[in-house]
């Protein structure tokens, strides 16, 4: 069984992300496994990693892709790192279903 890049919490879901900034276009590259064995969602954004532009583009892209408001997607950790943790606010089961559908499974 494949591990998931997210964990459910009482008030939402935490999504592990590996971000590539300054890409040719913003998009989803699927799930990958880091060297530590932890699964992460591989995403790319066109914005550069300057003054939070890539993080803002990341949260906006995730919110739009999952049908959430921007305020429902917050950066928990990884502000200056490529590996990030995002908190998605809402019903955990509904959010998990949306993430699974986004991933194509």
UniProtKB/Swiss-Prot annotation:
UniProt cross-references to InterPro entries, sorted A to Z: DUF167, YggU-like_sf
Tree of life domain: Bacteria
Pfam families, A to Z: DUF167
Coiled-coil ranges (or none): none
Gene3D superfamilies listed in its UniProt record: YggU-like (3.30.1200.10)
Annotated GO CC locations: cytoplasm
Entries under HAMAP family matching the protein: UPF0235
Family: Belongs to the UPF0235 family.
Record's protein name: UPF0235 protein Mchl_2407
Organism the protein comes from: Methylorubrum extorquens (strain CM4 / NCIMB 13688)
